[in-house]
């Protein structure tokens, strides 16, 4: 069994946009490495790769456009995120394929850029405000991603992809 999730990876342009987000004014944040930036469409937990890939392959998912908000926000006490719109239908399609029953948690599109350090919550906010121009990227494939946890942080590896139409 492997810890898995289904994700949309950001484009190079979106990564550049995320890199430009202001880091000032936030307290107790460990900034995530760029190669971990993604939008989770469905978190699966510990499961079998082959079973999930078989389910995902049945999908017939429509491509979508992810719209990154021009701001950071705290989600729960422990995550600093960029809200993401435009992926609700794609996430619903993925979730229909990979879960036997509807998930208890609704989909809230976001891309995590920071996590809290220790048990203290993230606080503060950027003093430079919103970035003037929002950014979007096309999602033309979804990825099944393995999450390996360690004291240094999570490592994510794509173990399979499915093209969107």
What role is predicted for each listed range?
Residues 1-165:
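Histidine-dependent nucleotide/RNA phosphoesterase domain, centered on the 2H-phosphoesterase fold
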